């Protein structure tokens, strides 16, 4: 993993296409071709999990299941599972530059239900049965959870009126399996569609020497099959409800901190069974990704624990995490893994020591590097080779939005001097050039920055609800000039993927 190369951060949902959201269809294959032509090595994406009401890929109904929004409908037509006429007149949203999650949910569900029904008439049922058998440990749990959740008007399991269902009593589960058999089939088969399409796309990328950098949230949602099945692995009360939740302490950016709301792991309980759940989670992740970025890595050293019911993150306290014991157990079971540690935020010597002991590369965000009054740990001149340098991530503004709206004149002047920006050079190009010229072995540009887009293209604004995760690229934005610019930076700063082969005809 440590050869000097580069890549692009572009989530699946942001790919162009006709059906309201990016998918595993032709535009995804075209994006791989774009990466090949520009001599990249890495395609970084956000988590692929099934998203909840806020549309965040970091709040999923399962740590293992995939987001069925990404199933490509044209592929289902090619497979005979849908008719082209089924897609005519369906309202997937009217703006090609953003995702309307409510519209695509209501538009896609009946289409996928139709495809599932048709699958048992014309599909490869034996292949599906093998998939179901191979993934039984999480698939049955997820299908049961979603079926019962839908039966109870999509309430989280902690709010279900049936106490026996909440407690997973065998008799209750058996009754719901019979009563909701069609829903169980729907969720099993759509997961099959998801993984069948994704693994084919990943194979195409890998065949062309492009590696997929996936993303793993450290926490799971309370409204998830994982917590429903394993309340003993979380800090909960007798009813299975979280007694404390995750977040970040107050800092210079937020006087009340960040209140994420995820349940906190009971690390003592996980330690007793040898971290089996984490080992399985990582094992499954490396079946679908080549490299995994683990979000909020510092939480493994110590994490901010907030009493459940708090209005802000301020009442929390730091609590020690599992430290190296977790990664030692993972290494013993799975061997060396290509992991990137998202080590942003409040850093201590202990967190740095843990990251260095694991050997995982950390992250550097160039937008954080420019402080005219003081040193920044994100400064390129301080970055070790074993790091990943970004213009920004999904949680940052675009470079153009940041430059215009988030920094003062003194910082703009310092940034111009530091990057040696020329009069004829755009701000975004100067930042991209600085990232690609850094010593970090991996340089990652966001697609929005390659397109030099403003704050309207920002992916997420942390600690806000609504309006996030919706940006999409349109087909006309990826011009030859954009391609040439990326290839030029990649060539000048010796980040060319030398393993590339000619695209298959």
Curated annotation (Swiss-Prot):
A Gene Ontology term for the protein's cellular component: cytoplasm
Keyword entries, A-Z: Carbohydrate metabolism, Cytoplasm, Glycosyltransferase, Transferase
Stored InterPro entries: Glyco_hydro_77, Glycoside_hydrolase_SF
Enzyme Commission designation: 2.4.1.25
Locations listed in the record: Cytoplasm
Xref: Pfam families: Glyco_hydro_77
Superkingdom per UniProt: Bacteria
GO molecular function, one term: 4-alpha-glucanotransferase activity
Catalysis: reaction(s): Transfers a segment of a (1->4)-alpha-D-glucan to a new position in an acceptor, which may be glucose or a (1->4)-alpha-D-glucan
Enzyme class: transferase
GO biological process, one term: carbohydrate metabolic process
Family classification: Belongs to the disproportionating enzyme family.
PANTHER family: 4-ALPHA-GLUCANOTRANSFERASE DPE1, CHLOROPLASTIC/AMYLOPLASTIC, 4-ALPHA-GLUCANOTRANSFERASE DPE1, CHLOROPLASTIC_AMYLOPLASTIC
UniProt protein name: 4-alpha-glucanotransferase
Organism: Streptococcus pneumoniae serotype 4 (strain ATCC BAA-334 / TIGR4)
Gene from which this protein is expressed: malQ
